[in-house]
Amino acid sequence: MNPYILTPDLNGEGLHIGIVRARFNEEIGQAELDACLQKLGELGVDERDIMVVTVPGALELGVALSHMAETFEFDALIALGAVIRGETYHFEVVSNEMARAISRISLETGIPVANGVLTVDTDEQAQARAAGKGGDCALVAVEMANLVAALEPEEDDEDEDEEDEDFDDEETDRR
């Protein structure tokens, strides 16, 4: 058996990437962003093809990601930030709702969203993971953008025109 295997494509040339970073826990989010931008550059993404916006906190990431997905032609999106556990249930609410929003946006739009929002117990844990997570998100965004593009059916203008004509004829016959 010889299955067709799509191998990971980490060539970022020509890709358009949108990044949303939460400003809450500023130092951690900025460390993630710096590492992410560096890795995107290493992967060949032109800095002119990257848009970065910031939002107040993790719960606002979803709104910005949703508008970016609907308004611009991004190949992938990246969410960055940190939610650090406190003494109340708020951590669970923010973490769960933020993750749910990110997944929903990706599934509903078909645009990959790399979730780089750290959910940790302490500032030290967040600081230790920030740069690595930012770079990982760049890799995920480029790989998934290329995978989605590879899985898209190729458009054949002549076949589309014929299909449109056939569909129009069927519609006419039904009336």
From Swiss-Prot:
Documented EC number(s): 2.5.1.78
Record InterPro entries: LS, LS/RS, LS/RS_sf
Extent of Acidic residues compositional bias: 152-175
Keyword entries, A-Z: Riboflavin biosynthesis, Transferase
Pathway terms, separated by semicolons: Cofactor biosynthesis; riboflavin biosynthesis; riboflavin from 2-hydroxy-3-oxobutyl phosphate and 5-amino-6-(D-ribitylamino)uracil: step 1/2
Binding site for (2S)-2-hydroxy-3-oxobutyl phosphate: E87, T88, R129
Protein name in UniProt: 6,7-dimethyl-8-ribityllumazine synthase
Organism name: Bordetella petrii (strain ATCC BAA-461 / DSM 12804 / CCUG 43448)
